[in-house]
């Protein structure tokens, strides 16, 4: 086991505080409409330019192990806030730094760290309750666009696009952000359920110009195994032919004799038909087939359920008003499923999303939820160069997360004003002087975001904060973008409550742990062994006669 270096008390806290300051100082320059960019070196390719707090925090790795521990703990504040609210990472970092700095001073003055932490927690709970009480619910598309615009650093086009996407696919729908191949940023909305499997044979195409197979008012057969034997399939095909309706077959695979017969029947015009592979793999494939069955009002034909393909009747097949199949994708629009059953399935998937701990699983479950609940919108972010596209994509991601958070818990006045006002409303009382000091730490610390936003704009923070607090209106504040005071909500300068609340709770949680640290342990760097000397020369060859 390697030897360890242990630091105690004040020495440990000073090192840790230095790490916190280095990380926070790099992150906080990005805060607000006049925040600056940070350039990050990449081991390959062009450097990355970003204004996204968590992206900056993730890149900071310090040489000194004790300083690095402080920086990594503050990085955790940004990461946790990003995971929960998707935005507000810079605000969380600024709050974390402010609480740690104030707390370290109090501990150095001889106060009890545990009581300070209790005081901090008391005050934070009161501020959170105050924010939730003041929250204004979002109702209109314009308000959604305002939140998106603020988070995208004042770019109205992005705000509008997000509002439009949310209007089309609903709050449950999935909105994905991709890099465009062109310089333009555009929005594409897919109605209904789409999955990434195309037709198994180009002979199924009904529109040769667009190379798509369109089936109107179609039956849908869902089978979880491979289909290669024609005999088992015949009863279903005969029943569908009688109805003169098209048929879509979704199975693990359709091959051999079965596929050849389907193609021949399609070409002869006796049967409008198309076949695609089922989406996903393993258990996820079963779940997605079940989703399609519920959406279309059909059943999955599965040996597990004791249903054989030969005994399938028309009422076991799903129905949809329109099915469109391209080379890569299949879209099912207007399935005939019961609304109550779809809602129950949506509820079940939401429950799974809450319970899962893996990001990948959560992402896949959210995709399934969107396909059932609304649809999918794709925002393709364009730009002149790759560096610009990446920077813009960061902002669109933040804006999208902020907008979702705003719809969930409502909005408050932006620009750090909501926290600034809350600092004057804290009435909590500690049971001793040290807890009172903890409450006062929060009073001062929650002014930090508003001060940092004005500092980044080159203004005098104390003057502006004083002027805002002189006015008694909850929504009165300073618009850093144009240097004017006014009603921030009507100006569209708003913050989602969930983002502000999460930032404060995470900052206080980690800062409380840092303040109460009394010892730090890190591995000592390994000393390189001295290089071995060169071997000695050969001895003399004495005593040899020639």
UniProtKB/Swiss-Prot annotation:
Looking up InterPro entries in the UniProt record yields: Chaperonin_Cpn60_CS, Cpn60/GroEL, Cpn60/GroEL/TCP-1, GroEL-like_apical_dom_sf, GROEL-like_equatorial_sf, TCP-1-like_intermed_sf
Which domain of life does this protein belong to? Answer: Bacteria
Identify a single GO molecular function assigned to this protein.
unfolded protein binding
EC number(s) recorded for this UniProt protein: 5.6.1.7
Q: What class of enzyme is it?
A: isomerase
Return the Gene3D superfamilies for the record: GroEL (3.50.7.10), GroEL-like equatorial domain (1.10.560.10), TCP-1-like chaperonin intermediate domain (3.30.260.10)
Pfam family, any one: Cpn60_TCP1
Q: Which UniProt keywords apply?
A: ATP-binding, Chaperone, Cytoplasm, Isomerase, Nucleotide-binding
The record's Gene Ontology cellular component field reads:
cytoplasm
From the UniProt record, list the reaction(s) this protein catalyses.
Answer: ATP + H2O + a folded polypeptide = ADP + phosphate + an unfolded polypeptide
**UniProt keyword annotation of Isomerase present:** yes
Q: Which family does it belong to?
A: Belongs to the chaperonin (HSP60) family.
Function (record text): Together with its co-chaperonin GroES, plays an essential role in assisting protein folding. The GroEL-GroES system forms a nano-cage that allows encapsulation of the non-native substrate proteins and provides a physical environment optimized to promote and accelerate protein folding.
Subunit comment: Forms a cylinder of 14 subunits composed of two heptameric rings stacked back-to-back. Interacts with the co-chaperonin GroES.
Q: What NCBIfam families does this protein's entry cite? A: GroEL, PRK00013.1, PRK12849.1, PRK12850.1, PRK12851.1
What's the protein called, per UniProt?
A: Chaperonin GroEL
Q: Can you name the source organism? A: Brucella ovis (strain ATCC 25840 / 63/290 / NCTC 10512)
- Which lineage ranks, top first, belong to the organism behind this chain? Bacteria, Pseudomonadati, Pseudomonadota, Alphaproteobacteria, Hyphomicrobiales
Q: Which gene encodes it?
A: groEL
């Amino acid at each position: 086991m390697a030897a360890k270096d242990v630091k105690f008390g004040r020495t440990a806290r000073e090192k840790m505080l230095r790490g916190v300051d280095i990380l926070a100082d790099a992150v906080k320059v990005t805060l607000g409409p006049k925040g600056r960019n940070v350039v990050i070196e990449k081991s390959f390719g062009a450097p990355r330019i970003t204004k996204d707090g968590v992206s900056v925090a993730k890149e900071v790795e310090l040489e000194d192990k004790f300083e690095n521990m402080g920086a990594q703990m503050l990085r955790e504040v940004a990461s946790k806030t990003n995971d929960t609210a998707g935005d507000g990472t810079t605000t969380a970092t600024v709050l974390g730094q402010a609480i740690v700095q104030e707390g370290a001073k109090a501990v150095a003055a001889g106060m009890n760290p545990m009581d300070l932490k209790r005081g901090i927690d008391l005050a934070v709970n009161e501020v959170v309750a105050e924010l939730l009480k003041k929250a204004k619910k979002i109702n209109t598309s314009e308000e959604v666009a305002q939140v998106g615009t603020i988070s995208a650093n004042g770019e109205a086009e992005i705000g509008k696009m997000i509002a439009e996407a949310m209007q089309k696919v609903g709050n449950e729908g999935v909105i994905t952000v991709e890099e465009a191949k062109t310089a333009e940023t555009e929005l594409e909305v897919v109605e209904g359920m789409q999955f990434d499997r195309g037709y198994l044979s180009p002979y199924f195409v009904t529109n040769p110009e667009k190379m798509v197979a369109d089936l109107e008012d179609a039956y849908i057969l869902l089978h979880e195994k491979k289909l290669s034997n024609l005999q088992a399939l015949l009863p279903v095909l005969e029943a569908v032919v009688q109805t003169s309706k098209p048929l879509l077959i979704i199975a693990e695979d359709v091959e051999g004799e079965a596929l050849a017969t389907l193609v021949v029947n399609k070409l002869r015009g006796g049967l409008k038909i198309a076949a695609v592979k089922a989406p996903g793999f393993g258990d996820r494939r079963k779940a997605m087939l079940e989703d399609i069955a519920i959406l279309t009002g059909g059943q999955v034909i599965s040996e597990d359920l004791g249903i054989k393909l030969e005994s399938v009747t028309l009422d076991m097949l799903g129905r949809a008003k329109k099915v469109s199949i391209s080379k890569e994708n299949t879209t099912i629009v207007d399935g005939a499923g019961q609304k109550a059953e779809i809602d129950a399935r949506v509820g079940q998937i939401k429950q799974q999303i809450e319970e899962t701990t893996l990001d990948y699983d959560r992402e896949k479950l959210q995709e399934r939820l969107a396909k059932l609940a609304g649809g999918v919108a794709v925002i393709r972010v364009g730009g002149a160069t790759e560096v610009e596209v990446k920077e813009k994509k960061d902002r669109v991601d933040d804006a999208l997360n902020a907008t979702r958070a705003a719809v969930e818990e409502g909005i408050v006045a932006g620009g750090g004003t909501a926290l600034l006002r809350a600092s004057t409303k804290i009435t909590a009382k500690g049971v001793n002087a040290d807890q009172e000091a903890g409450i006062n730490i929060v009073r001062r610390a929650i002014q930090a975001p508003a001060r940092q936003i004005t500092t980044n704009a080159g203004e005098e923070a104390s003057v502006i904060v004083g002027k805002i607090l002189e006015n008694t209106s909850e929504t009165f504040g300073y618009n850093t973008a144009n240097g004017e005071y006014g009603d921030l909500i009507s100006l569209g300068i708003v913050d989602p409550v969930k983002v502000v609340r999460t930032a404060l709770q995470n900052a206080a949680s980690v800062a409380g742990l840092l303040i109460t640290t009394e010892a730090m342990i890190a591995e000592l760097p390994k000393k390189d062994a001295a290089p071995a000397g060169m071997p000695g020369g050969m001895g003399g060859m004495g005593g040899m006669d020639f």
